[in-house]
Protein backbone atom coordinates (compact mmCIF):
# COMPACT_ATOMS: atom_id res chain seq x y z
CA UNK A 1 0.00 0.00 0.00
CA UNK A 2 2.93 2.34 0.61
CA UNK A 3 1.76 5.95 0.76
CA UNK A 4 -1.89 4.89 1.19
CA UNK A 5 -0.96 2.85 4.24
CA UNK A 6 0.71 5.85 5.86
CA UNK A 7 -2.24 8.12 5.00
CA UNK A 8 -4.70 5.61 6.44
CA UNK A 9 -2.69 5.20 9.64
CA UNK A 10 -2.47 8.97 10.09
CA UNK A 11 -6.22 9.20 9.48
CA UNK A 12 -6.84 6.67 12.25
CA UNK A 13 -4.45 8.45 14.63
CA UNK A 14 -6.34 11.71 14.12
CA UNK A 15 -9.61 9.90 14.86
CA UNK A 16 -8.16 8.65 18.14
CA UNK A 17 -8.18 4.92 17.36
CA UNK A 18 -6.13 2.69 19.65
CA UNK A 19 -2.85 1.15 18.39
CA UNK A 20 -4.44 -2.30 18.50
CA UNK A 21 -7.40 -1.22 16.34
CA UNK A 22 -5.07 0.50 13.89
CA UNK A 23 -2.94 -2.61 13.57
CA UNK A 24 -6.05 -4.71 12.91
CA UNK A 25 -7.41 -2.39 10.23
CA UNK A 26 -4.03 -2.12 8.49
CA UNK A 27 -3.70 -5.91 8.53
CA UNK A 28 -7.06 -6.36 6.78
CA UNK A 29 -6.24 -3.67 4.20
CA UNK A 30 -2.98 -5.49 3.45
CA UNK A 31 -4.80 -8.82 3.06
CA UNK A 32 -7.32 -7.18 0.72
CA UNK A 33 -4.50 -5.76 -1.40
CA UNK A 34 -2.78 -9.16 -1.59
CA UNK A 35 -6.05 -10.86 -2.53
CA UNK A 36 -6.62 -8.66 -5.59
CA UNK A 37 -2.96 -7.76 -6.27
CA UNK A 38 -4.13 -4.20 -6.88
CA UNK A 39 -4.00 -0.93 -5.00
CA UNK A 40 -7.06 -0.74 -2.73
CA UNK A 41 -8.06 2.67 -4.08
CA UNK A 42 -8.83 1.00 -7.44
CA UNK A 43 -11.30 -1.49 -5.94
CA UNK A 44 -15.06 -1.11 -6.27
CA UNK A 45 -17.82 -1.76 -3.74
CA UNK A 46 -18.49 -5.05 -5.54
CA UNK A 47 -14.84 -6.04 -5.12
CA UNK A 48 -15.01 -5.39 -1.38
CA UNK A 49 -18.28 -7.31 -1.08
CA UNK A 50 -16.80 -10.32 -2.89
CA UNK A 51 -13.79 -10.30 -0.57
CA UNK A 52 -16.00 -10.16 2.54
CA UNK A 53 -18.01 -13.10 1.17
CA UNK A 54 -14.69 -14.91 0.64
CA UNK A 55 -13.88 -14.44 4.34
CA UNK A 56 -17.35 -15.66 5.37
CA UNK A 57 -17.90 -18.58 2.98
CA UNK A 58 -14.46 -19.81 1.94
CA UNK A 59 -12.25 -18.87 4.88
CA UNK A 60 -14.99 -19.35 7.51
CA UNK A 61 -13.51 -16.60 9.64
CA UNK A 62 -14.90 -15.80 13.08
CA UNK A 63 -17.52 -13.06 13.17
CA UNK A 64 -15.30 -10.67 15.12
CA UNK A 65 -12.58 -11.01 12.45
CA UNK A 66 -15.06 -10.32 9.64
CA UNK A 67 -16.55 -7.38 11.53
CA UNK A 68 -13.10 -5.88 12.08
CA UNK A 69 -12.32 -6.18 8.36
CA UNK A 70 -15.67 -4.60 7.48
CA UNK A 71 -15.14 -1.71 9.91
CA UNK A 72 -11.64 -1.09 8.58
CA UNK A 73 -12.81 -1.10 4.96
CA UNK A 74 -15.67 1.27 5.75
CA UNK A 75 -13.31 3.71 7.46
CA UNK A 76 -10.80 3.50 4.60
CA UNK A 77 -13.27 4.04 1.76
CA UNK A 78 -15.85 6.33 3.36
CA UNK A 79 -13.50 8.13 5.75
CA UNK A 80 -10.13 8.39 4.02
CA UNK A 81 -11.14 8.23 0.35
CA UNK A 82 -14.48 10.03 0.96
CA UNK A 83 -16.44 7.81 -1.39
CA UNK A 84 -19.65 8.55 0.41
CA UNK A 85 -21.95 5.71 1.40
CA UNK A 86 -20.30 2.31 1.24
CA UNK A 87 -22.43 -0.38 -0.36
CA UNK A 88 -20.86 -3.53 1.01
CA UNK A 89 -22.33 -5.40 3.96
CA UNK A 90 -21.90 -8.31 6.36
CA UNK A 91 -24.60 -10.30 8.19
CA UNK A 92 -25.70 -9.17 11.67
CA UNK A 93 -23.88 -10.67 14.62
CA UNK A 94 -25.17 -14.15 15.49
CA UNK A 95 -27.36 -14.12 18.60
CA UNK A 96 -25.87 -17.30 20.02
CA UNK A 97 -22.44 -16.66 21.49
CA UNK A 98 -20.08 -19.25 22.89
CA UNK A 99 -19.07 -18.88 26.51
CA UNK A 100 -15.35 -18.15 26.84
CA UNK A 101 -13.19 -21.17 27.59
CA UNK A 102 -11.66 -20.96 31.05
CA UNK A 103 -8.86 -23.06 32.52
CA UNK A 104 -8.97 -24.27 36.13
CA UNK A 105 -6.54 -22.43 38.40
CA UNK A 106 -4.28 -25.50 38.40
CA UNK A 107 -3.90 -25.36 34.62
CA UNK A 108 -3.06 -21.65 34.69
CA UNK A 109 -0.33 -22.42 37.23
CA UNK A 110 1.00 -25.21 34.99
CA UNK A 111 1.20 -22.84 32.01
CA UNK A 112 3.01 -20.15 34.00
CA UNK A 113 5.39 -22.70 35.53
CA UNK A 114 6.26 -23.96 32.03
CA UNK A 115 7.70 -20.61 30.92
CA UNK A 116 11.28 -20.61 29.74
CA UNK A 117 12.63 -17.62 31.67
CA UNK A 118 11.84 -15.02 34.31
CA UNK A 119 10.64 -12.38 31.85
CA UNK A 120 8.14 -14.76 30.26
CA UNK A 121 6.94 -15.87 33.69
CA UNK A 122 6.47 -12.26 34.81
CA UNK A 123 4.58 -11.43 31.61
CA UNK A 124 2.08 -14.29 31.94
CA UNK A 125 1.65 -13.86 35.71
CA UNK A 126 0.87 -10.17 35.25
CA UNK A 127 -1.55 -10.85 32.39
CA UNK A 128 -3.50 -13.42 34.40
CA UNK A 129 -3.43 -11.95 37.90
CA UNK A 130 -4.42 -8.47 36.69
CA UNK A 131 -6.85 -9.54 33.94
CA UNK A 132 -5.08 -7.54 31.25
CA UNK A 133 -5.59 -7.48 27.50
CA UNK A 134 -2.45 -8.38 25.57
CA UNK A 135 -1.96 -4.82 24.30
CA UNK A 136 -2.34 -3.55 27.88
CA UNK A 137 0.29 -5.83 29.41
CA UNK A 138 2.80 -5.18 26.62
CA UNK A 139 2.42 -1.40 27.09
CA UNK A 140 2.86 -1.36 30.86
CA UNK A 141 5.47 1.04 32.20
CA UNK A 142 7.37 0.33 35.45
CA UNK A 143 5.73 3.30 37.19
CA UNK A 144 2.29 1.75 36.61
CA UNK A 145 3.13 -0.92 39.22
CA UNK A 146 1.96 0.78 42.42
CA UNK A 147 3.33 -1.57 45.07
CA UNK A 148 2.32 0.54 48.08
CA UNK A 149 -1.34 0.37 47.06
CA UNK A 150 -1.03 -3.13 45.54
CA UNK A 151 -2.58 -1.88 42.31
CA UNK A 152 -1.64 -1.77 38.63
CA UNK A 153 -2.65 1.29 36.62
CA UNK A 154 -3.88 0.48 33.13
CA UNK A 155 -3.27 3.64 31.13
CA UNK A 156 -5.39 4.40 28.06
CA UNK A 157 -6.70 0.89 27.57
CA UNK A 158 -9.42 -0.11 25.11
CA UNK A 159 -11.94 2.69 24.75
CA UNK A 160 -9.41 5.09 26.30
CA UNK A 161 -10.60 4.37 29.84
CA UNK A 162 -7.86 4.44 32.47
CA UNK A 163 -8.45 2.06 35.36
CA UNK A 164 -6.83 0.24 38.26
CA UNK A 165 -6.68 -3.50 38.70
CA UNK A 166 -5.21 -5.96 41.18
CA UNK A 167 -1.53 -6.40 41.94
CA UNK A 168 -1.20 -9.85 43.51
CA UNK A 169 1.52 -10.36 46.13
CA UNK A 170 3.12 -13.25 44.20
CA UNK A 171 3.08 -11.20 41.01
CA UNK A 172 4.76 -8.28 42.79
CA UNK A 173 7.54 -10.55 44.05
CA UNK A 174 8.07 -11.99 40.56
CA UNK A 175 8.12 -8.48 39.07
CA UNK A 176 10.73 -7.41 41.64
CA UNK A 177 12.90 -10.41 40.75
CA UNK A 178 12.42 -9.55 37.09
CA UNK A 179 13.32 -5.90 37.70
CA UNK A 180 16.57 -6.83 39.44
CA UNK A 181 17.57 -9.21 36.63
CA UNK A 182 16.47 -7.27 33.53
CA UNK A 183 16.49 -3.59 34.59
CA UNK A 184 13.66 -2.54 32.22
CA UNK A 185 13.60 1.07 31.05
CA UNK A 186 10.63 2.97 29.64
CA UNK A 187 8.60 -0.19 29.01
CA UNK A 188 8.17 -2.99 31.53
CA UNK A 189 8.24 -5.72 28.87
CA UNK A 190 10.26 -5.31 25.68
CA UNK A 191 11.23 -7.52 22.75
CA UNK A 192 14.39 -7.32 20.67
CA UNK A 193 14.18 -3.53 20.51
CA UNK A 194 14.62 -2.25 24.10
CA UNK A 195 13.18 1.16 23.19
CA UNK A 196 9.78 -0.21 22.16
CA UNK A 197 7.16 -2.28 24.00
CA UNK A 198 7.08 -6.01 23.38
CA UNK A 199 5.20 -6.78 20.14
CA UNK A 200 1.80 -8.39 20.69
CA UNK A 201 2.81 -11.31 18.46
CA UNK A 202 5.79 -12.01 20.72
CA UNK A 203 3.55 -12.14 23.80
CA UNK A 204 1.22 -14.55 22.00
CA UNK A 205 4.14 -16.81 21.07
CA UNK A 206 5.33 -16.85 24.69
CA UNK A 207 1.88 -18.00 25.80
CA UNK A 208 1.52 -20.67 23.11
CA UNK A 209 5.00 -22.04 23.82
CA UNK A 210 4.34 -22.24 27.56
CA UNK A 211 0.94 -23.86 27.01
CA UNK A 212 2.48 -26.49 24.74
CA UNK A 213 5.20 -27.25 27.28
CA UNK A 214 2.64 -27.54 30.08
CA UNK A 215 0.48 -30.06 28.23
CA UNK A 216 -2.65 -27.95 28.81
CA UNK A 217 -5.03 -28.13 25.85
CA UNK A 218 -7.94 -26.03 24.65
CA UNK A 219 -8.41 -22.31 24.69
CA UNK A 220 -7.13 -19.80 22.21
CA UNK A 221 -4.43 -17.19 22.71
CA UNK A 222 -3.10 -15.26 25.67
CA UNK A 223 -6.51 -13.53 26.01
CA UNK A 224 -7.74 -16.77 27.61
CA UNK A 225 -5.84 -15.72 30.75
CA UNK A 226 -8.05 -12.62 30.98
CA UNK A 227 -11.16 -14.82 30.83
CA UNK A 228 -9.65 -16.96 33.59
CA UNK A 229 -9.01 -13.91 35.79
CA UNK A 230 -12.64 -12.78 35.62
CA UNK A 231 -14.14 -16.23 36.11
CA UNK A 232 -11.83 -17.14 39.00
CA UNK A 233 -12.71 -13.87 40.76
CA UNK A 234 -16.43 -14.63 40.47
CA UNK A 235 -15.73 -18.21 41.62
CA UNK A 236 -14.12 -16.65 44.71
CA UNK A 237 -17.22 -14.55 45.44
CA UNK A 238 -16.20 -11.17 44.00
CA UNK A 239 -19.29 -9.30 42.79
CA UNK A 240 -19.73 -8.70 39.08
CA UNK A 241 -19.65 -4.89 39.41
CA UNK A 242 -16.16 -5.06 40.91
CA UNK A 243 -15.07 -7.41 38.13
CA UNK A 244 -16.49 -4.95 35.60
CA UNK A 245 -14.35 -2.12 36.98
CA UNK A 246 -11.16 -4.19 37.03
CA UNK A 247 -11.73 -5.56 33.53
CA UNK A 248 -12.49 -2.12 32.10
CA UNK A 249 -15.80 -3.20 30.57
CA UNK A 250 -18.17 -0.44 29.51
CA UNK A 251 -21.22 -2.67 29.89
CA UNK A 252 -22.22 -4.82 32.86
CA UNK A 253 -23.57 -7.46 30.45
CA UNK A 254 -20.04 -8.07 29.15
CA UNK A 255 -18.85 -8.92 32.66
CA UNK A 256 -22.01 -10.89 33.43
CA UNK A 257 -21.07 -13.58 30.91
CA UNK A 258 -18.47 -14.79 33.40
CA UNK A 259 -21.26 -15.43 35.90
CA UNK A 260 -22.78 -17.77 33.30
CA UNK A 261 -19.40 -19.52 32.95
CA UNK A 262 -19.26 -20.00 36.72
CA UNK A 263 -22.82 -21.39 36.87
CA UNK A 264 -22.05 -23.79 34.02
CA UNK A 265 -18.79 -24.97 35.62
CA UNK A 266 -20.55 -25.55 38.95
CA UNK A 267 -23.47 -27.42 37.38
CA UNK A 268 -21.26 -29.83 35.45
CA UNK A 269 -19.21 -30.39 38.60
CA UNK A 270 -22.27 -31.40 40.62
CA UNK A 271 -22.30 -28.30 42.83
CA UNK A 272 -24.93 -25.60 43.15
CA UNK A 273 -24.38 -21.92 43.79
CA UNK A 274 -26.73 -18.97 43.56
CA UNK A 275 -25.01 -15.88 42.22
CA UNK A 276 -27.06 -12.75 42.87
How would you label these PLM feature ranges?
Residues 1-276:
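Conserved catalytic core of the tyrosine transesterase superfamily
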Amino acid sequence: MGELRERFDNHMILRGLSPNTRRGYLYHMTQLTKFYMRSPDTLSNDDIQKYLLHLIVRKKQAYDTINQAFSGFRLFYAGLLRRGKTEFHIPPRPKMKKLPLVYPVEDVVRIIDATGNLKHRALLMTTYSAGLRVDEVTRLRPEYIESKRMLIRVDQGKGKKDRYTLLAAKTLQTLRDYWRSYKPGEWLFVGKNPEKPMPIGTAQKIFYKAKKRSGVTGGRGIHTLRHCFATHLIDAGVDVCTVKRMMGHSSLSTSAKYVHVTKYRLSVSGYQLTVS
